[in-house]
Design a protein with these regions (language model features):
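Conserved GNAT-fold acetyl-CoA-binding loop/helix
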Residues: 22-42
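Conserved acetyl-CoA-binding loop-helix of GNAT-fold acetyltransferases
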Residues: 98-115, 133-137
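Conserved beta-hairpin
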Residues: 50-66
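Conserved acyl-donor/pantetheine-binding loop and adjacent beta-alpha core of acyl/acetyltransferases
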Residues: 67-101
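A short beta-loop-alpha structural element at the N-terminal edge
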Residues: 2-16
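A short helix-loop-beta-strand connector motif used in the catalytic cores of GNAT acetyltransferases and
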Residues: 43-55, 72-74
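Conserved catalytic-core motifs of GNAT/GCN5-like acyltransferases
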Residues: 123, 141-155
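Conserved GNAT acetyl-CoA-binding A-motif
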Residues: 116-127
Length: 163
């Protein structure tokens, strides 16, 4: 597997992956996190234009997609029922999804993102047990709860370099 920055030529593949992910989430007890329309096409296109959309390829085929940036995420400013592991600059991952054809694609993407910054934050819905399991296996620590821009709560995770 390899990671590269997404281009607009990847849009059809990305849309298929997100459609698969929404269906998978709904069938695994998490129908509300992304509903039937998230992420919207204009958000995906914006991520691509800004250089923050990444794809994971296997045998020259796009199998996963995610948002990665080294930035302060406004929704991570306030954390409830806990604390972040540190106050150092961090990378963030959002909107990670795979097409389900290659086992471990999400873990590969998250490991790549961590290798870029060594201090990574991510959040997920309380019903997204699959992602919670992936994050636990990769030694992300549950830090508390954050609120998204629409006010819904998410479980906040962080992984920091052990040095």
């Amino acid at each position: 597997m390899k990671i590269r920055i997404a281009t607009l030529k990847d849009l059809d593949s990305i849309l298929r992956i997100y459609e698969h992910a929404r269906s998978f989430m709904a069938s695994h007890g998490n129908p509300t996190q992304w509903g039937t329309t998230y992420p919207p096409v204009d958000m995906i296109e914006h991520d691509i234009r800004m250089g923050n959309a990444y794809v994971c390829e296997e045998n020259n085929r796009v199998i996963a997609v995610f948002y990665y940036a080294f930035e302060n995420d406004v929704t991570y400013t306030t954390i409830y029922d806990g604390n972040w592991l540190n106050d150092a600059p961090y990378g963030v991952v959002h909107r990670i999804a795979s097409d389900g054809t290659v086992k471990g694609a999400a873990s590969f993407c998250l490991s790549w993102a961590f290798s870029q910054c060594h201090n990574l934050k991510i959040d997920t819905h309380q019903d997204n047990l699959v992602m919670q399991s992936v994050l636990a296996k990769l030694d992300f620590k549950k830090c508390g709860t954050i609120l998204t821009e629409d006010g819904s709560s998410r479980i906040a995770y962080q992984k920091q370099d052990s040095k």
